């Protein structure tokens, strides 16, 4: 499976998360996953909440439309984005 998979109602992203980074950004491919750096520390779910907010902003959807399907407690996550309004260029490249 590639890092980005298109489904009927959205996208499924396989992510590798780097918490406590200097800034929030989609870095690029990391093996067969998309690397995302976020500023939040991995404490008490702060990183997950921050990741959902960041992904929602990047894809221009509500936070409720970003669902962590797998990897709640680890760096490797699978996220579903329902009906994205915009797709960032880093992700568009991987869809082709």
Curated annotation (Swiss-Prot):
Signal peptide: none
GO cellular component: cytoplasm
InterPro entries membership: DUF167, YggU-like_sf
Domain of life: Bacteria
SUPFAM superfamilies assigned: YggU-like (SSF69786)
Family recorded in the similarity comment: Belongs to the UPF0235 family.
Stored HAMAP family: UPF0235 (MF_00634)
Protein name: UPF0235 protein YpsIP31758_0827
Organism: Yersinia pseudotuberculosis serotype O:1b (strain IP 31758)
């Amino acid at each position: 499976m590639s890092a980005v998979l298109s489904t009927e109602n959205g996208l499924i992203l396989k992510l590798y998360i780097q918490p406590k980074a200097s800034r929030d950004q989609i870095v690029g491919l990391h093996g067969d996953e998309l690397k995302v750096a976020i500023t939040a520390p991995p404490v008490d779910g702060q990183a997950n909440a921050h990741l959902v907010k960041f992904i929602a902003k990047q894809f221009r959807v509500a936070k409720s439309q970003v669902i962590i399907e797998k990897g709640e407690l680890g760096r490797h996550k699978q996220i579903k984005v329902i009906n994205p309004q915009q797709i960032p260029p880093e992700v568009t490249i991987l869809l082709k």
